[in-house]
Amino acid sequence: MKLALISPKGVGMGTNEENRWTEELYDSLSGIDSLRELMSCANSPLLTVASILESFFDEMEYIDEEIEDIDWEKQYDMVAMSFMTQQASRAFEIAGQFNEKGVYLIAGGMHPTNSPDETLQYFDTVFVGEGEITLPQFMNDYLENKPLRIYKNTHEINMDEVPLPRYDLLKMDRYRTIPLQISRGCPHNCEFCASTKVYGPKYRHKSVDRVMQEIEMIQKIKPNSHIYFTDDNMLVKKDFAIELLDALKDKKL
């Protein structure tokens, strides 16, 4: 089977044609190249999904609409998307086109978790919350021709047990900034933030050794790359933050 992991372009994100105002903002500011690169960063959750599902598929392809177009001539058995609200309208458009081809569609991430009913109008299966446990459950159901329409995570995921992202799927020559998630959850439950709704109020983080392992892997795959910590709040635990920063300093990072 062949799986496409698609990161949809979004309003106000990246450097695609629809975001000309973003380009104008970049051009109006000096020394802003790092912001441009950051906004064109790869989709970290999808790379983790690829690791979780790799044993179920013969072939996987990661497609980032911020750097390339979808090749509608290619054939896939399944399409997976992870997206935020500013990407939702485009995600639904993509889903509609693949639906016409009879491709099975699955979705997760911030928007599907917070708006599952809306997302189910366009996708065959929606994942609410973290997918490390529910994704393999879904695949087993799918292979037995009895997939559910919605899977909700009810377990607390140990961050050190999260599979290493499939960075090897990236077209590395198109990226300078590589994403790295080291924690999930936040105790503050701010009204403007969806983090607690997706990951819960308990702050969970990878060990410093695990973080450094991932950084070393990124450096081997993409030397001299920028690393973007995608965490919603990586400074919740002061002792951990200091330990991590000391480790980064020791490695001259």
Predicted regions and their residues:
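Short, glycine/serine-rich, charged loops/turns that create anion-binding
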Residues: 10-12, 67, 112, 233-234
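A cross-family glycoside hydrolase active-site/sugar-binding cleft signature
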Residues: 6, 82, 106-108, 181, ...
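Aromatic-acidic/polar surface patches that form glycan- and anion
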Residues: 38-42, 46, 87, 204, ...
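Flexible loop residues that form catalytic
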Residues: 8-11, 84, 131, 198, ...
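Beta-sheet entry/capping signal
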Residues: 2-3, 125, 225-227
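Radical SAM [4Fe-4S] cluster-binding motif and immediate context
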Residues: 160-253
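Short glycine-rich His-centered loop
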Residues: 3-38
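Glycine-rich beta-alpha loop elements in corrinoid/cobalamin-binding modules
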Residues: 45-161
